[in-house]
Amino acid sequence: MLYPKLQAVTPLDDYMLALVFSNGEKRVYDFKPNLTHKFYKQLNDVELFKRVTVNDGEIEWATGQDFCPHTLYEMSVRCN
């Protein structure tokens, strides 16, 4: 399957992420389940979590964590 490219991310309350993809879809992803994994433990700091950015189609944080854009697309809920 060819996935649309992630273009924008906005952190929301309760570790949710608002996502915008290149096909115009707006989706929401609940990041909370990932926070139990050691790799994402630092992101329990909500201020750090809110500093999420998009780099070349995937989300990342300055502390080195990133997340697969295909998983974001498949596991998120469409809003439009």
Segments and roles (model prediction):
Residues 1-80:
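Motif-centric detector for short Cys/His coordination patterns
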